[in-house]
Amino acid sequence: MKTKITLSGFAGTGKSTVGKRIQEQLNFEFVSVGNYSRQYAMEKYGLTINEFQEQCKAQPELDNEIDEKFRLECNSKENLVIDYRLGFHFIKNAFHVLLKVSDESASKRIRLANRSDEVTSTKAIQQRNQKMRDRFQDNYGVDFTNDKNYDLVIDTDDLTANEVADLIIEHYQKSNAVSKIPSVNFHLWQPCNMRCKFCFATFLDVKQEYVPKGHLPEDEALEVVRKIAAAGFEKITFAGGEPLLCKWLPKLIKTAKQLGMTTMIVTNGSKLTDSFLKENKAYLDWIAVSIDSLDEENNIKIGRAITGKKPLSKAFYYDLIDKIHQYGYGLKINTVVNKVNYKDNLASFIAKAKPKRWKVLQVLPIKGQNDNKIDAFKITDEEYANFLDTHKDVETIVPESNDEIKGSYVMVDPAGRFFDNAAGTHNYSKPILEVGIQEALKTMNYDLDKFLNRGGVYNWNTNKNQDLRKEEVSYE
């Protein structure tokens, strides 16, 4: 997994501005050989950068000295974005980017940035660029303008600095993708205000053994999200427990969105307020509401009720769905088919609700999660098939049998560990924040074919899922 990004290119490509934007988005440290040279010249020789550059003309070995020191420092660290034309040559374990710009655009950008110490005519820029190219070829025998030296080459003429940064982040994350399955469910919050008796993600074991509060601290949860994004996952679903009990859920959603992921929450709906819907519409793409039945008595039997006693009404669900549509979210409905509701007919409700996806899951026994109560809710394959047959005319239905569920989801538990359920129990990795994404994934048993066959890849980039990172930033 590459832990650094290097930026190369001629003057006027906006390397510094782009680098700082990437720093903000990926929480990387931004370093530049120019800033390093200024500091080094003053601390070691007591010279300004202009004085030092004049001395380098008489003593070319000083350039080599800077490159050697800078190379060693950068290679000793991780999570860097590096403004360095020779980064492709000297920096290891990095994603190398070349930024291109026409001489005319470079001249205009330098003038607009009011960099009084730089010449701005196109002829002067051409001469400066050629001298730079010749110097690197003479000193190191490399051509920093050769596209073949880079992982990504971008023509920046018609792009803003933000657009360039976004392209780099997108390609960097894809290059680092360590999972063939592009989506992940982060069960960040173990506590829940409902008491579904068949719940196959209670995480009582996790709470008892690892996180007594049932969740990570805010800063650690944010770091898990950053690492998930950096690993190349394209979509993240925040689940629980009940994720809306988490006060910092909006921060996690915003961070995930700014890092380029499609965002979703899975909620029982009881805490989905107008204020949440209004305040998060810029960063949250999808809302999945868990609705097993519209019959309040059935929901009490199931436990899908607040504290297990207060079910949500049919009117509540209809009103909630209207609000979700009103604010422009992509709507998904999840229904767990079990012994209590397998004879229900929800076709009329689904027709009115108009979800883009109606996921219909066969209730799933998971050892260590729902052993004590699952027997009363298990259904046969035939009973599950009957429910599907009742709703065969629903176009948006997405069935998931027990076999299709097991091993087909990439999931993270409330302690920040990957887990799978392929063997009918939870198998946990080491914590992501201790060993990293790649190492944590090694012990997981995820099945790409199952993921694809159950429809795990779909058009989650809806019109709601637009790029919200493009706040205009001028080149400096």
From Swiss-Prot:
EC number: 4.2.-.-
Record-listed [4Fe-4S] cluster binding positions: 192, 196, 199
GO molecular function: 4 iron, 4 sulfur cluster binding; ATP binding; lyase activity; metal ion binding
Ligase recorded as keyword: no
Positions contributing to ATP binding: 9-17
Gene Ontology biological-process annotations: defense response to virus
Record keyword Iron-sulfur present: yes
Region described as Prokaryotic viperin domain: spans on this chain: 183-476
Keywords attached to this entry: 4Fe-4S, Antiviral defense, ATP-binding, Iron, Iron-sulfur, Lyase, Metal-binding, Multifunctional enzyme, Nucleotide-binding, S-adenosyl-L-methionine
Enzyme class (EC, first level): lyase
Region (Cytidylate kinase-like domain): 1-168
Residues covered by the Radical SAM core domain: 176-400
Domain of life: Bacteria
Cofactor(s) listed in the protein's UniProt record: [4Fe-4S] cluster
Record-linked NCBIfam families: viperin_w_prok
The family this protein is said to belong to: In the N-terminal section; belongs to the cytidylate kinase-like family.
Chain's role: Expression of pVip60 in E.coli (strain MG1655) confers resistance to phage T7; prevents culture collapse upon infection. Catalyzes the conversion of guanosine triphosphate (GTP) to 3'-deoxy-3',4'-didehydro-GTP (ddhGTP), probably via a SAM-dependent radical mechanism. The modified nucleotide represses transcription from T7 RNA polymerase-directed genes (possibly by acting as chain terminators), strongly suggesting these nucleotides block viral polymerase transcription.
Protein name: S-adenosylmethionine-dependent nucleotide dehydratase
